[in-house]
Amino acid sequence: MRIKEILNTAAINSTITAEGWVKTKRELKGFSFIEISDGSTMNGLQVIIDGNLADYEAIIKKLNTGAAVTATGLVVESPGKGQRIELQAKAVTVHGEADPETYPLQKKRHSFEFLRTIGHLRGKTNTMGAVMRVRNACATAIHQFFQERGFIWAHTPIITASDCEGAGEMFAVTNFDLANPKRTKEGAVDYAEDFFGRPAYLTVSGQLEAEVMAMAFKDVYTFGPTFRAENSNTSRHLAEFWMVEPEMAFCDIVGDQDLAEEFLRYIFKYVLEACPEDMEFFNKRIDNSVLATAQNIIENEFARITYTEAIALLEKSNKTFEFPVEWGIDLQSEHERYLAEDLFKKPLIVSNYPKDIKAFYMRLNDDQKTVAAMDVLAPKIGEIIGGSQREERLDVLERRIQEMNIEAADLWWYLDLRRFGTVPHAGFGLGFERLVQFMTGMGNIRDVIPFPRTPLNAEF
């Protein structure tokens, strides 16, 4: 049984076996207490080890913080506050010791900076344990949300030849000897001789491939790792992160916004119900507005404004921004957070951005100046969802590709979707780690993923 199940359901006077790692030990005259945890819950199980147990002294000597243990015994009612039961051990097995002189985790609050240096052990701490349980609940809620609505989970490729965002910040995939790659007569790298016969990269987004799937299955979603070779050493950026990207045929920008709002509300409600102890922990120890923010999202409709209205509100704010505000700029995090935190005090959706700052595939509006794009902005995070109605008109899409100096031949298959049964369609992308960061109040995105990948850091 997992310790969470034992704490919640184990009957008094029943005999059970508990497995886990020692969090604390207290030695008293004639007996000892240990608390063991297995990661299934914030709370540990208290185990009482009587001094009359065979090999008591040898066992207790090994039961230091971090030791792996199995304890079998009788469930009894606990006289202590805050715990329903405890376990009176009849047999204890120590599987692996942890030397207290060298084990880096002890019963004290460690800094997140220190914990990042021992990423292989930090999951054992209360904070990181809570993060991973909330992360798991978020992932479960995402799949459940889409499956309940008939979406197909599309497995899009991690190795790709396309750059969805057009940013060029992609990790190359090659089988060449980097010290001596094969070259053409002109001296350029000869990708025709490489593994895929052409340049290949780690994906920055599964969107374009999801559009392919949506043209056959109507409503699909992707949920997987994406990669960005962006040399940003900040608390908001990762080189490897997970994205959720639904794509819906027969859908416009309004339907896209409706789904995004419903989606976020569903996830927050699910996590509050699935992880109440963990969310209380974050509210108490990390950010005392976490629970209020979650309830705000669940109970209130998101504000919706256009980009033009957002610019007007920013200009009227009399606030001095690092990046000056004028129509045509790409909203920066400081602008997004001012709108969400200070002005509206809740998530809002900004739509209809200037075409010159958005991707080629976004549908051109009738004003010929803006595209049917939308961003969901959240307090403390800024943009948490970005999406758009896609350009379904072949002639307009071809013109946009030409205007942005993109090689149309590389997108022949994407253009084919507009030649054969084109239809209005829309979708969005959610940065999964930013969602978890927003949910938990954690200040650094590196602390909401098990193994963060950042510039000059690829440990494990």
UniProtKB/Swiss-Prot annotation:
GO terms for cellular component: cytoplasm
Family matches, as InterPro entries: Aa-tRNA-synt_II, aa-tRNA-synth_II, aa-tRNA-synth_II/BPL/LPL, Asn-tRNA-ligase, Asp/Asn-tRNA-synth_IIb, NA-bd_OB-fold, NA-bd_OB_tRNA
GO molecular function: asparagine-tRNA ligase activity; ATP binding; nucleic acid binding
Gene3D superfamilies: Bira Bifunctional Protein, Domain 2 (3.30.930.10), Nucleic acid-binding proteins (2.40.50.140)
EC number(s) per entry: 6.1.1.22
Listed Pfam families: tRNA-synt_2, tRNA_anti-codon
Gene Ontology biological process terms, A to Z: asparaginyl-tRNA aminoacylation
Reactions catalysed according to its record: tRNA(Asn) + L-asparagine + ATP = L-asparaginyl-tRNA(Asn) + AMP + diphosphate + H(+)
Subcellular location(s) of the protein: Cytoplasm
This protein's UniProt keywords: Aminoacyl-tRNA synthetase, ATP-binding, Cytoplasm, Ligase, Nucleotide-binding, Protein biosynthesis
Subunit structure: Homodimer.
Family per similarity comment: Belongs to the class-II aminoacyl-tRNA synthetase family.
Record's protein name: Asparagine--tRNA ligase
Natural source organism: Picosynechococcus sp. (strain ATCC 27264 / PCC 7002 / PR-6) (Agmenellum quadruplicatum)
Chain's gene name: asnS
